[in-house]
Amino acid sequence: MAAAHKVFELSHVFKDVSKIGDDESVCSPNEDYFGVPWKIVLRHKDEKMGVFLSCEKPSNNDAHCIVNVVYSVKLMSSSGVCYIKSDSKLFGEITEHGWVNFVNWNTMVDAFLIDDSIIIEVLVKTIFMSGLPKKSPKNFDESNKEFSDGIVVVKHQNFHILKKFLAFHCEYLEKLFFGDFKEAGKAEVTLKAISSTDFHYLLAVLYEDYAIDDDNVGGILRLASYLQVPIVIRKCEQFLIEGSGKPMEIRLDIAEKECLQNLKKHCLSKVGTADQIEAARAILPSDIPKRALKKFDESNKEFSDVIFVVEHNKFYVLKQILASHSSHFKKIFVENVDKREFTLADIDSNDFQNLVEVMYGVSFIDDLTVEGVLHLAHMYDRPFPMQKCVEFLIDLSEKSPKEKLKIAKAYQLKNLEKAALARINLPESIRAALSCDMAQMEVEVLKALMQKALFHLSDTKVHTETFF
């Protein structure tokens, strides 16, 4: 799978352009992407019109931020006249990149100014990001007590956890909590010789609350290997293949030390010799088989406290997992404290299987499952799976922009809508998007598509070059 580059689009109508004096600048409103404010800067100087992309350092972040992007700036008029320039730049100490002389000021006035306004669009694709602000991982202190049944102590720090959930993912912890260890049955157990920070991150990743990054992947992977938590090892490997900015040589070293064969194959394909690549292929299948479905049938009874019946199939699950992510299910459990079995009507059992897998953190959403998971997540008020579906659709899905726009409209997903529109730039993709029932489109979506269509109908393309 290709690396998950982030793509977004900034667009702004600059008004009262004639009032912008020499050596003056005006800016579009800040728009937040990845915790960083972005904006378009328009500058008038020496009869030249400068256009710049600004990536400001967040005010609450002391880290050294680096963002490498390719970007395309488009100046367009309502008649379809268009002028485009593209570049690749690194934002860090320098927070603004662009062109002092994007176009001659008088040319802009004659060709692009309509009602004293101009339209500027900037399409941005990130190549690498580092040092950006990160949300804090989920707390496992007393505030998580409602959704816990035990405490794990690491370096004098208490983590309130759900024992059956951890046992579900980790055979070692299953034996520790429920096996022949002396700690079995105790409300509090202590883990020695590990980092409390790494354990915190490991829990957060298991609970699907925290993103792995280049700063924490080493500690998480070492601990996941030590405790043998397969799903976290898999997620670390996937990140190192798809999202890491670490040099290939370092990733290859990690692959060797942790026996991550898929990562090793990926790294050798990028930096290895012909003999090394051939050797890697010899020990690895050319196609990774589709993962087996995680079973929530009676074999999972030991790690469950409630049953859901869907299309005559029984799913043995934990109340706390469902309740912690869904106000709908939390209400059901509160109103039916002693009830052990519930029936869900009019939903597909395969969709429910996929949804539960996402909730348990054992499934990666794909193009085959995303719509079913999204439908149930919306139906049962589950923000977390919805967020995961949107992230997949924006970053990794191979669905067409037209399909994504349809999904965005059905579930009112504005971020997905904006990302899909940013991908629609070629004539064929515009035609495909406009081929659906335009009466069902949001006005702003239709307007954006028509503007893009006007550009491609124009015979006056002064300059076009793009990395996209």
UniProtKB/Swiss-Prot annotation:
The UniProt entry, under Pfam families, shows: BTB (PF00651), MATH (PF00917)
Keyword list, A-Z: Repeat
Domain BTB residue range list: 148-215, 304-368
**Ranges where the MATH domain occurs:** 7-124
Q: Disulfide connectivity?
A: none
User: Is NADP one of the keywords?
Assistant: no
CDD domains linked: BTB_POZ (cd01165), BTB_POZ_ZBTB_KLHL-like (cd18186), MATH (cd00121)
Q: Keyword Heme, does the record have it? A: no
Instruction: Give the PROSITE patterns listed for this entry.
Output: BTB (PS50097), MATH (PS50144)
Q: Identify the InterPro entries for this entry.
A: BTB-MATH_domain_protein, BTB/POZ_dom, MATH/TRAF_dom, SKP1/BTB/POZ_sf, TRAF-like
Do you know which PANTHER family this protein is assigned to? BTB AND MATH DOMAIN CONTAINING-RELATED, MEPRIN/TRAF-LIKE MATH FAMILY-C.ELEGANS
Protein name (Swiss-Prot/TrEMBL): BTB and MATH domain-containing protein 45
Q: What is the lineage of its organism?
A: Eukaryota, Metazoa, Ecdysozoa, Nematoda, Chromadorea
